[in-house]
Amino acid sequence: MDLEHQTMETFLRWAAEIGISDSIDSSRFRDSCLGHSLSVSDFPDAGGRGLGAARELKKGELVLKVPRKALMTTESIIAKDLKLSDAVNLHNSLSSTQILSVCLLYEMSKEKKSFWYPYLFHIPRDYDLLATFGNFEKQALQVEDAVWATEKATAKCQSEWKEAGSLMKELELKPKFRSFQAWLWASATISSRTLHVPWDSAGCLCPVGDLFNYDAPGDYSNTPQGPESANNVEEAGLVVETHSERLTDGGFEEDVNAYCLYARRNYQLGEQVLLCYGTYTNLELLEHYGFMLEENSNDKVFIPLETSLFSLASSWPKDSLYIHQDGKLSFALISTLRLWLIPQSQRDKSVMRLVYAGSQISVKNEILVMKWMSEKCGSVLRDLPTSVTEDTVLLHNIDKLQDPELRLEQKETEAFGSEVRAFLDANCLWDVTVLSGKPIEFSRKTSRMLSKWRWSVQWRLSYKRTLADCISYCNEKMNNLLGTQDRLRDL
């Protein structure tokens, strides 16, 4: 039995001892909290380590119950430590998330003396959230909105770390637990792993409950993406947004004083059991959870729009003007464009009624809308440093770098603006990789940078594919409309 398997068994035994169970009958002590409904399994092509069905499961069936005493919250942590409680009470200006971050670092500093040690041992030590991106990975996103979101996330993390500094000093945490890197880890842990609880806006860390991989809302065919360290709910906390979602996913239930998680659909024996924790675009998934989906029906692509267009869109929120992942325009965007491309003198009540109903104003106007949108998307694509084809090849080359059995040819490292070479140069690996003629093993730091760089390229490729799909959609619709116009003229 390998060390990883042994430590997992120890963790599941500890979880059973504190009342966590995948069985309705949790009164009987077992060596593991799992085995009745769930089992820890490996899903190499669907998120890595996750939870599989130990039997046939029905939609809405309880699959895991975690008592309140087992949840890791600010309340449960300070209840076990008077020194921590007294210090926290003197810092009311800190947010609940900052307090939980400090509490997490405080517990980590105790190491094996912490009550939570069996659980903390299994928390990943690295994350791929936007706030953890270095300058190279940030610039690799290419799109201004994504670069700005990364800078904003990093600045927010730095500001919160500085604000919490005095509390961490009062607790006499060792320098390594007070460092920005430690804070970045704690902040990422809480952002990506916490579950919603009604009594604390920071949420809670839920042992075993964070082993589930992610399923997009209302999409049971969606396959989880990325490595285990990047997309299971170990790194992506469950957020329950509606009562109906709670019934098929999970939530804290006062009547049983426990967090209860449910099967969101029927599962066969051995099939991976997934949970949904909200509706997010791919950029939001990267920002808050450190992964994205290859196919995400909730993704949105925003492009630069004229100021005069926004003034006409006052009836809709600014973030409703977007392109769906399949290339189609959102209701608000196409409605606004229809109005914007009509001369102001023709914007009478009948036109406005058509606009707000989401109806086509005229064939001529619709052709103008499709032509303008196609040209706009083409302009955005041309302004970006690399193309869809180039990014597709680059992703393949990054995969080669990640595989110790493969080696890039020199021509591959010099292609497409030398982005691969820039990565190797940044890690002092250019000469080693190209001249040695042998595969090399990257350091942990370089491997983490490589992983984040891959997410950046994958995200920008998805962005560009959506724009390309939008061009195809608009051109096809425009051609159909022109054909209709010609047929009407011939009548």
Curated annotation (Swiss-Prot):
GO terms for biological process: methylation. GO terms for molecular function: methyltransferase activity. It is an enzyme of class 2 (transferase). It holds the Pfam family SET. Disulfide bonds: none annotated. Its EC number is 2.1.1.-. InterPro entries: Rubisco_LSMT_subst-bd_sf, SET_dom, SET_dom_sf, SETD3_SETD6_MTase. Keywords: Methyltransferase, S-adenosyl-L-methionine, Transferase. Signal peptide: none annotated. Residues 36-278 form the SET domain. The keyword Transferase applies. Belongs to the class V-like SAM-binding methyltransferase superfamily. PANTHER family: PROTEIN SET DOMAIN GROUP 40, UNCHARACTERIZED PUTATIVE METHYLTRANSFERASE. This is Protein SET DOMAIN GROUP 40. It comes from Arabidopsis thaliana (Mouse-ear cress).
